[in-house]
A protein has these predicted regions:
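ABC transporter nucleotide-binding domains
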Residues: 3-6, 11-186, 191-205, 211
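Active-site-adjacent beta-strand anchor residues
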Residues: 90, 231, 259, 283-284
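C-terminal coupling/interaction segments
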Residues: 261-302
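Short, surface-exposed acidic/glycine-rich loop or hinge patches that mediate macromolecular interfaces
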Residues: 65-68, 105, 209, 233, ...
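ABC transporter nucleotide-binding domain
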Residues: 170-260
């Protein structure tokens, strides 16, 4: 079952089409990475999911209900942090949460529960003005968690964080998903961070979804543009042998470089050269498959 279903979502600012009919499915219980370069349409999509922008075309369904028809009921089950958290700098974490607790009509004990979840229980009398960026982001998540949502929507929550802050944020989100069953939809342009965190991924570029599915499927997908690099005792002969096999190798700074389509091709090239009496001194597959996949997907224009 999908927690979020988006169909043929189109959005325009003036004459510019920001979203060109995207489809988005977030499985319930997943950590879904919404991945794409800056300006791809990620924040616009999340704002539409939260009803912060008026939908122009398409359908949005959350928890099996239409956002158009059940907006208030749906948003009671959703927590969100879009861009930077909105907090009162002169108030403490507890005081910021107390204001919103009254709005949500949560029991008083919920404040300490969410502060413990995000590791801010010991901030005591410190005002939000004194918080580090990482602490402010965690306070923003505490605010989003206050009313015990089933879905957490986060827009670039690791932006500006130092390496330690990024690790803390990653572990927090994993814990919320694992121990509390919260479905998490997180946007980012940081491929390496998304790879370590999510179960499912959608790649958006120029307002169009380029890929959607389990992260494991994206990793298995064979991109174009991967290379095989090698050195032999006779590169001239190696070039001729490879050409006879239909492999277009080229000389590049003392090495031979040729395209590859699979890991099996690496072994085949090695066997071919050795069978012709060549000595292969070095053989390496170039390119990060996941990185190459991502770059290939986002560079395609509609």
């Amino acid at each position: 079952m999908n927690c979020v279903e988006v169909r043929e979502l189109v959005h325009r600012y003036g004459g510019d089409t920001v979203l060109g009919g995207i489809e988005l499915q977030v499985p319930q219980g997943s950590i879904y990475g919404f991945l794409g370069p800056n300006g791809a349409g990620k924040t616009t999509t999340l704002r539409l999911l939260l009803g912060l922008l008026k939908k122009q075309q398409g359908s949005i369904t959350l928890f099996g209900q239409s956002l158009d028809a059940h907006r208030i009921d749906i948003l009671r089950k959703v927590g969100a942090l879009i861009e930077s958290p909105s907090v009162y700098d002169h108030l403490t974490a507890v005081e910021n949460l107390e204001l919103l607790r009254r709005v949500h009509r949560c029991p008083p004990r919920r404040i300490q529960e969410v502060l413990s979840l995000v590791d801010l229980a010991d901030t005591k009398g410190k005002s939000a003005r004194q918080f580090s960026l990482g602490m402010r982001q965690r306070l923003g998540i505490a605010i989003a968690l206050l009313h015990s949502p089933e879905l957490l929507i986060l827009d670039e929550p690791t932006n500006g964080l130092d390496p330690n802050g990024i690790i803390e944020m990653r572990e927090l989100l994993k814990r919320l998903n694992r121990e509390h069953g919260i479905t998490i939809l997180i946007s980012s342009h940081l491929l390496a961070e998304i790879e370590r965190l999510v179960t499912d991924v959608g790649v958006i570029s120029h307002g169009v979804m380029r890929f959607q599915g389990p992260m494991s499927e994206l990793k298995r997908r064979q991109p174009r543009g991967l290379t095989l690099s090698l050195r032999t005792n006779d590169d001239g002969k190696a070039l001729r042998v490879l050409a006879e096999q239909g492999l277009g190798a080229r000389a590049d700074e003392g090495r031979l470089v040729l395209p590859r389509s699979s890991d099996g091709e690496v072994a085949a090239v090695n066997r071919c050269l050795v069978s012709q009496g060549l000595e292969v001194y070095e053989l390496s597959a170039g390119g990060n498959d996941l990185e190459a996949n991502f770059m290939e997907l986002i560079e395609v224009r509609p």
